[in-house]
A protein has these predicted regions:
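Juxtamembrane transmembrane-helix boundary signature
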Residues: 77-82
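Hydrophobic alpha-helical transmembrane segments
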Residues: 1-76, 91-100, 105-245
Length: 245
């Protein structure tokens, strides 16, 4: 049931988990890297098919753009929303209380719009770099897994900005056992991808530390939106590193 809960939360795949309010949602975090690998496997498969088609010759950037759209579609844009909200809240000179209010505001501000555009452009360019060689495609499987593993670490280690927010809800039941399962899963996935799989496993937690420490400094802790921003920053940083090495 925890596995189905993770699939239902992190993707738009048509699963119907049996929700049990007595089961702490944090237990599902043990499967986050596995779901990330599922997302990445779909993306790698689509990328392989695109590279074998006539699309790269007809429109070189189109396969990468379609893959980025598929990435957002599979996840339902869940983490992109958190990234945009965090850009609006974290980069304006206001009080901690005002930042938390901005996170609740459903409207997209200028910082959020620019931040979202920059993130997607960088991600698009990195995907284009990875799709230059079939040997790099396994990285697409590891990147989403490593980013969600980094999220599990952040949720376990860093404090919450609100004791009753969404982040607090999803962290309930997250313990050392879940972190250990997520870590072993992420390491195995990276190892199966070869030496290039190590790159996301190193870069994703570093990106997580940057976002988490910024959130602690300006919000007092992590929120549900920060969780999403961590995933997006970790994915993007890992993609950039993977396409440069």
């Amino acid at each position: 049931m925890d596995l189905l809960r993770a699939i239902g939360l992190l993707t738009v795949l048509p699963v119907r988990p049996r929700w049990d309010e007595r089961t702490a949602p944090g237990r599902a975090m043990a499967f986050y890297p596995l779901i990330g690998a599922l997302i990445g496997g779909i993306l790698a498969g689509l990328a392989f098919l695109a590279m074998k088609s006539r699309l790269p010759a007809m429109a070189p950037l189109l396969p990468s753009a379609l893959l980025l759209a598929a990435w957002a579609g599979i996840t339902g844009g869940l983490h992109l929303d958190g990234w945009a909200d965090c850009c609006d809240a974290l980069f304006v000179p206001v009080t901690r209380e005002r930042r938390l209010e901005i996170l609740h505001d459903p409207r997209l501000g200028s910082f959020g719009g620019v931040g979202l555009a920059v993130l997607l452009l960088v991600k698009l360019a990195a995907i284009q770099g990875i799709m230059t060689s079939p040997a790099r495609l396994p990285v697409l499987i590891v990147v989403p897994a490593a980013a969600r593993w980094a999220l599990v670490i952040a949720a376990r280690v860093f404090p919450l900005a609100r004791p009753d927010g969404m982040a607090a809800h999803f962290r309930q039941g997250l313990g050392a056992r879940e972190v250990a399962i997520a870590t072993v899963t992420a390491v195995v996935i990276a190892a199966l991808a070869g030496w290039r799989g190590i790159i996301p496993l190193v870069v994703a937690p570093l990106a997580m530390l940057v976002m988490a420490r910024l959130a602690v400094a300006r919000l007092g802790g992590l929120t549900g939106d920060v969780y999403g921003a961590i995933v997006e920053l970790a994915e993007t940083a890992a993609l950039v590193a993977a396409c440069l090495i």
